[in-house]
């Protein structure tokens, strides 16, 4: 029996396994109830009395080494498995969720699509602008309140440079390098020096449109406005134009639509008037055309501008404008079905 034990000791010392399945086969072969070591234990009762001490010590040594070898191989495979699940420090600590389109992007694209079908092309310009394109070229007087630091963000090191207060500056840039017919729509971010509240923000988004050609009339403007209102808010939408003032248009007007919440009957949202203001518009002032190199005696045009937040607010009844810039996924997910 001593010879048999020594043979098994050599085998156990040389045990190898390529994977956990092979290791389980070896465990069964040597350490299970029907394994080789247990068979020797069963034969131990037949050993002569004078050899029992020596054989017993050898059997215990064999069993211990076999168990240690199997455990060592098992630990090796366990470490390999754990290595496959090591902590990835590049992964986010928060669950990664699929994004959705921002409500402002949804409405912006709707507005662009409506005007694109009318033949308008997209024009864009810089958000950091000069005084000429934001004010002077658009007929703003030297003492106009918009030029004051209370309303506009100026660049401290360059007094004539500022964050644009409207996308009308894009219209000026297009007119000074183009000749009519001009038919453009100008979406973009603008900045105003205003206190942040549920009704106002220091930055927001605008879309402005400009059409310049021969014999453009206020009637053309009104038809475009009516079509836009019906496309954006529904076929039953009514519009009304109220006289107003803007430096770059004459005559100027503000456009209201019949309240899309109460159907024009009156509610808290429309202050019980049945009407809600959505944009400003008018015929391009001849001084603006001339300042930008277009002969006002030959050409005329109209312009209109609206806040994207305002239109989104009306479409989806968002009461707090700050929610558009807070990036709260709970709020944004409410618009998944909107596109």
Curated annotation (Swiss-Prot):
Mg(2+) binds at residue 250. Binds 2 magnesium ions per tetramer. Keywords: Aminoacyl-tRNA synthetase, ATP-binding, Cytoplasm, Ligase, Magnesium, Metal-binding, Nucleotide-binding, Protein biosynthesis. It is found in: Cytoplasm. GO terms for molecular function: ATP binding; magnesium ion binding; phenylalanine-tRNA ligase activity; tRNA binding. Its cofactor is Mg(2+). The keyword ATP-binding applies. Pfam families: Phe_tRNA-synt_N, tRNA-synt_2d. One of its GO terms (biological process) is phenylalanyl-tRNA aminoacylation. The keyword Cytoplasm applies. It is an enzyme of class 6 (ligase). Transmembrane segments: none annotated. Its EC number is 6.1.1.20. InterPro entries: aa-tRNA-synth_II, aa-tRNA-synth_II/BPL/LPL, Phe-tRNA-synth_IIc_asu, Phe-tRNA_ligase_II_N, Phe_tRNA_ligase_alpha1_bac, Phenylalanyl-tRNA_Synthase, tRNA-bd_arm. Belongs to the class-II aminoacyl-tRNA synthetase family. Phe-tRNA synthetase alpha subunit type 1 subfamily. Tetramer of two alpha and two beta subunits. This is Phenylalanine--tRNA ligase alpha subunit. The gene is pheS.
């Amino acid at each position: 029996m001593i010879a048999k034990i020594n043979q098994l000791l050599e085998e156990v010392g040389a045990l190898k396994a390529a994977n956990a399945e092979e290791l389980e086969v070896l465990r069964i072969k040597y350490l299970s109830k029907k394994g080789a070591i247990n068979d020797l234990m069963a034969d131990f009762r037949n050993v002569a009395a004078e050899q029992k001490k020596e054989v017993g010590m050898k059997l215990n040594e064999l069993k211990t080494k076999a168990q240690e070898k199997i455990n060592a191989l098992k630990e090796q495979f366990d470490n390999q498995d754990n290595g496959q699940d090591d902590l990835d420090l590049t992964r986010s600590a928060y669950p990664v969720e699929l994004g959705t389109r921002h409500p402002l992007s949804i409405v912006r694209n709707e507005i662009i699509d409506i005007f694109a079908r009318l033949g308008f092309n997209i024009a864009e310009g810089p958000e950091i602008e000069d005084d000429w394109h934001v004010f002077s070229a658009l007929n703003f007087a030297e003492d106009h309140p918009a030029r004051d630091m209370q309303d506009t963000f100026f660049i401290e090191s360059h007094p004539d440079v500022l964050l644009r207060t409207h996308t009308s500056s894009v219209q000026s840039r297009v007119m000074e390098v183009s000749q009519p017919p001009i038919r453009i729509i100008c979406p973009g971010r603008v900045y105003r020096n205003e206190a942040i509240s549920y009704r106002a923000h220091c930055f927001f988004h605008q879309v402005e449109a400009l059409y310049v050609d021969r014999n453009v009339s206020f009637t053309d403007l009104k038809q475009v406005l009516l079509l836009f209102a019906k496309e954006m808010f529904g076929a039953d939408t009514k519009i009304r134009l109220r006289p107003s003032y803007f430096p770059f248009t004459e005559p100027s007007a503000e456009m209201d639509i019949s309240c899309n919440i109460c159907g024009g009957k009156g509610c808290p949202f429309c202050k019980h008037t049945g009407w809600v203001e959505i944009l400003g518009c008018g015929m391009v002032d001849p001084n603006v055309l001339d300042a930008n190199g277009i002969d006002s005696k030959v050409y005329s045009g109209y312009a209109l501008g609206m806040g994207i937040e305002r239109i989104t607010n009306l479409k989806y009844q968002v009461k707090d404008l700050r929610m558009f810039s807070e990036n709260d996924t709970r709020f944004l997910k409410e618009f998944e079905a909107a596109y």
